[in-house]
Each structure stands twice: as C-alpha cells, then as structure tokens.
Regions:
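N-terminal Rossmann-like dinucleotide-binding module
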Residues: 17-94, 173-176, 269
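Basic phosphate/pyrophosphate-binding loop/patch that engages nucleotide-derived ligands
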Residues: 159-164, 181-194, 217-220
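Rossmann-like dinucleotide-binding domain that binds NAD(P)(H)
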Residues: 219, 227-317
Length: 451
C-alpha cells in the first residue's frame, strides 16, 4: 500500500465528515449543488477517475472512453495487471500518456482536477470509496448492488445527500427501451391497481472466473495487494475460487445471485410501482413493510457459500405483494406486474403483455407525446451520468433509488438466516422488535477500515 497518504488519517477524515450529520431517511431528497471550485461546466469535458477496472470495471471504462464530452484521467486498482492494462487502454484512446495510475484509490480521490469517479469494485468495497468521494466533492457512478450491508447503504445515501453529489448506479436496465415501456404500461394504469409483482432472479453459482469451487488455498498472483483487496472484509486465506469475478459467491465479499441481481430486476419492479395510484411510495422511498424468506445454503465454510435457491415474499403498502425468487420455475426471470386487467412481463431483450396491443399503444403514445405518464428516455447509462454532472439534474438511478431497490434483498437474506418474518419500518429503515435480525443489518469491518 502506498505510504504517502496515511490510511488512518484518511479514514479518520471520512468518519469525521460522516458523523457531522446524523443519518436521515432516504426519502429526503436534496437538490444536488455545485460546490465552489468544481471544474466541470456545460462546455467542459467531465474528468473522471475509475476505481476498479476488472471485469465490470473494464466495461464501464470502455463506456466512458466512448463518450466525447468526458475524459478519463486516472485509474486505481490493487491488481497491477488490471491497472496497467487499463492505463494503456486509456492512453491509446487519447493518444498520449496522460492517464495516472494508482494502487490506492484514496490518492485518486484527492485529485482536485477530477469531477467524478466510477466505482466498480467488489460489493464489500463500495461504501468506503463512495463516502470518501462524496466527502471530497466528487460525483459518483457506482456499480450495483449499492452496498454490502443495508446500513452501509444508509450511510452512503446520507453522504451523497449531505454533499449534494450526482449519483448514477450501474442499474442500466432503466436506460433500455423494453424496461421503460413496461414501467410506463404499469404506471399508466393498463393493469389497473397492481396486486402482485414477481421478480425472477438466477439461482446457483455461475463460474464466471473459470476456477470452479474446489481449488485449494494458495498465494495471490504477483502484483496483487491481497490485504488491500480484502480491505474491510474479514481476512481469509487467498483462494482463486473466490477472487476475481467469483468473489460474489462468498458472503465475505459478495451477496450471491440475490444481491448480484436485486439492483436490476427489483429495481425495475419498484420503477413500475412508483406511481401514486399504487400507494407504495415514490421511487426513492418505496419499500416493504413485512418480509419472509426461505433459502438453501451451502456449508458456511464452503468456498462458495451464498444461497443457491431463495424465495422471498414482501408485503408492500396498499396490499401489493412482491415475490423475489431464484430457482423456482414458476417465477419467470425478469419482472412481472399483475393487476385485475392483466399483466406485463419484461426481461432483457423481451417484453410481453396479456394484451399485446398495449405495447404498441405505449410505443405510439410515447412517440406522439400523448403519454400521460412518460418516463425519461436515457441517451445511454454512462452518457446520462456525464450529462447530469454538467446539468446537476438527477439521474435515472440516484443513490436513494438504488438503496430502496436493494433493501428487499438485504431483508430477504436476513429473514432466511433468522428463519422468521421481519417487520420493517420503511420510513425509519429499522427492523421492528427483532434484535437478532437488526444485528445483521451491518457487519464489523476489519480494522483499520470503518465508515
């Protein structure tokens, strides 16, 4: 780890800034402000630093490199091979050698010439860089799920609101036509009052890293600062099966299929429910009042120990029931809203409705401008973030929305662990009358890391 910035001093400054304001309800929205000295203007290129440039981080880097009105100035990654490859890619794109390389993300965040950061680290490394970036006056693009624990998400929302930052989550489905059309169908009342939503997620474990789950512990690859990679998670021996890409299958660093996908399909479910007619609350405050769940888990000490199958039932206000399931064939992958007048189902590359003519009507009305409730049509997920950094307008997936979208996943996991139904106060963001479950809203971070 780099020595020119004190880890303890840096973290202390984050903690002091975070403690300056008590945590607030995520339903409180503040208008993003432009602090004095922010470099970006309507005519300037937005200058970005990328933290984490592995699998998804590499894809996000490519997206920003393809945008003419932004410039990637710096890369941070604890894996030297990822870092070097990304820096070379940036320099080749701009045909110069201007991209700075850092192992320590804290050095990147302190740069005064950066307007924004893109955080594409594993789940356990979202909250600390995000809060630090917000406190440093940076706007933030961050991967989903928003946070490794629910309480980390609350702290992230508070930091972004207090500092008036623009935030975009990597829940890119909101920037796609099929998902927008489906949510518009629901919000425009084609189904009547929605009574049930089915959210189908993948199950099991996908071997994205190509390692399988039976390799023995060993030494980390050359050029990897494994202590820094583990960071606030609990120290575990290095094992290639729970490293790049496959870290998501161990609860120390990820949240399994449930949390890997909750920020996609449950996010879309909430988007459809965000109309006042359903009584579930606005998009940035919607949430369940009761959650019950069952799940199948490998052994706790297994290399991959996240749930392989899960079924979560959530009661929302105004008699709306939301089912989130993985491994149950009757719950089709994607998002399906059901009401007395019919249903609509959407997944990647697919939209269907009980009345196919509805889809044609929505498309025609959207085109003509006659749609009563018209949702924002994104120019592209990364482009919209860049545009919002300049305009200071909220994005499609601000931090408040991301937090509410992931909440049923966190609560569903907790309910499956304690084995009982949870009562949830969505306004106060507290579990009611269950001390054991409440403890699972957060994790102890490995010293010296803390929020």
């Amino acid at each position: 780890m780099t020595k020119n910035i004190s880890r303890r001093d840096f973290i202390g400054s984050i903690a002091a800034a975070t403690a300056a304001t008590a945590l607030t309800s995520c339903s409180t929205i503040s208008t993003p402000r432009r602090p004095a000295g922010l470099r970006a203007t309507q005519n300037a290129k937005v200058q970005i630093g990328c933290i984490g440039v592995g699998w998804q981080g590499g894809a996000n880097l490519d997206a920003f490199l393809g945008i003419s009105d932004c410039r990637v100035l710096a890369i941070a990654d604890v894996d030297a091979s990822h870092l070097n490859d990304a820096v070379n890619k940036v320099n080749a794109r701009y045909q110069d050698k201007g991209c700075a390389a850092y192992k320590d993300f804290r050095e990147l965040i302190t740069r005064a010439d950066l307007d924004a950061v893109c955080i594409s680290t594993p789940d356990h490394w979202h909250s600390i860089p995000a809060i630090a970036a917000a406190n440093a006056g940076k706007d933030i693009f961050c991967e989903k799920p928003l946070s490794h624990t629910l309480n980390e998400g609350i702290a992230m929302v508070e930091a972004v609101q207090r500092n008036g930052r623009i935030w975009q989550t990597g829940s890119w489905q909101r920037s796609q036509n099929f998902f927008r059309w489906a949510a518009e169908l629901v919000q425009n009342g084609y189904l009547g009052k929605v009574t049930r939503v089915e959210v189908g997620l993948p199950s099991g474990h996908a071997d994205f890293g190509g390692t399988g789950n039976t390799k023995p512990n060993g030494e980390p690859p050359a050029g990897v600062d494994y202590d820094f990679w583990i960071g606030p998670a609990q120290m575990m021996p290095f094992n290639p099966c729970r490293f790049h890409k496959n870290w998501r299958w161990n609860y120390n660093t990820g949240g399994g299929q449930l949390m890997d996908w909750i920020g996609h399909h449950c996010d879309i479910a909430h988007w459809g429910l965000a109309s006042p007619q359903f009584g579930c609350g606005p998009d940035d405050a919607v949430g369940p009042s009761e959650v019950s769940a069952t799940a199948e888990f490998p052994a706790k000490d297994a290399v991959w120990n996240t749930a392989t199958k899960f079924h979560i039932e959530c009661k929302y206000p105004n008699a709306v029931n939301v089912v989130i399931a993985g491994g149950y064939g009757e719950i089709k992958g994607g998002t399906k809203w059901i009401g007395p007048q019919g249903w609509v189902h959407v997944d990647r590359g697919h939209i269907a409705a009980s009345n196919p003519e509805w889809i044609k009507e929505i498309q025609a009305q959207e085109k003509s401008g006659n749609l009563k409730i018209r949702l924002y049509k994104s120019p592209g997920h990364a482009q919209e973030f860049v545009d919002s950094v300049k305009s200071r307008k909220r994005t499609l997936t601000p931090v408040e929305v991301a937090h509410r979208s992931q909440t049923p996943g966190h609560l569903g996991y907790i309910a499956s662990v304690v084995g009982r139904t949870l009562k949830w106060n969505a306004a106060k963001q507290q579990i009611i009358g269950d001390a054991e479950a409440t403890k699972l809203l957060s994790k102890t971070m490995r010293a010296p890391w803390h929020l």
